[in-house]
Amino acid sequence: MNIFWLSFKDYTRFEFFKYALLSTLIGFSFMMIVGYYSFTSIKAFLDAFFMPESEGFFAWLYSFAFVSFIINSLNFLVVGFFVIFTSSAISLFILSFFTPKIAAKINAKYYHHEPKEKMGDVALLLELFKILLKFIPLFFLALILFFIPFVNLIAFFLAFYYLFHNALILEVLSAVLDKKKFKEQKFTPFEFKFHTLIFYLLASFPLAGLVLQLFFVIFLIHLSYQKIYFLSPKLDNFSSST
């Protein structure tokens, strides 16, 4: 069966979907609260900085409605971009506590792979720390490019894609692969990068990134068993359970 449809069937089952309820609720709350206060705070700062009473070229330029509209639109786009992906990251982080259970259920249901020694918590935290260390300079570079239209969006897009891809892959592979197999994965296969890019684009839409996090995880779990361990799902077990 196609991995997409197999993942979609699992995604719609309550035994899996229940794990996404808490992460979706917290991520949505963060998006609404932080998004509102971030936009209004930055707008208030810009209005105060470019207030008409102050003298200077930038204050004069900001007094034009067209210029004010462009700056506030950029503010909305960048803040919206940041809040959407940050809320998705928080949702993904919460869901990561349930990913080992999700992977174990999928393995028991379809693949019957005998798990060996898993990654330890310390080793997993070290891998996450390495990802964050590489993400920080990318994020600061994006901040430097903040006031360059369109370039700022591309910079933030690439920086957060790096974090999204690596965090999602780490979350899934650490739950699926044993310690030895994990260390052998020096490079992520192109097929994984392609799908995480598609997931990242979907996550750029408000709410979609929150609701579909569980699907992303389930899909990559199936992909890992089939493309790394080269296992085929036992569909007879699947058919008998439906």
Model-predicted segments: where are they?
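Hydrophobic alpha-helical transmembrane segments of multi-pass membrane transport/permease proteins
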Residues: 19-42
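Long hydrophobic alpha-helical segments typical of transmembrane helices together
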Residues: 187-242
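Interfacial aromatic "cap" segments that immediately flank transmembrane helices
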Residues: 7-25, 115-142, 168-173, 177-203
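Long, highly hydrophobic alpha-helical transmembrane signal-anchor segments
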Residues: 38-81, 117-138
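Selective recognition of hydrophobic, aromatic-rich stretches within alpha-helical transmembrane segments
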Residues: 73-104, 146-175, 207-231
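Residue-level signature of transmembrane alpha-helical entry/exit and packing/kink sites
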Residues: 19-20, 68, 72, 76, ...
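Membrane-interface segments at transmembrane-helix boundaries
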Residues: 1-8, 49-62, 89-125, 166-186, ...
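Membrane-embedded alpha-helical bundles that form the substrate/pore pathway
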Residues: 31, 72, 203-207
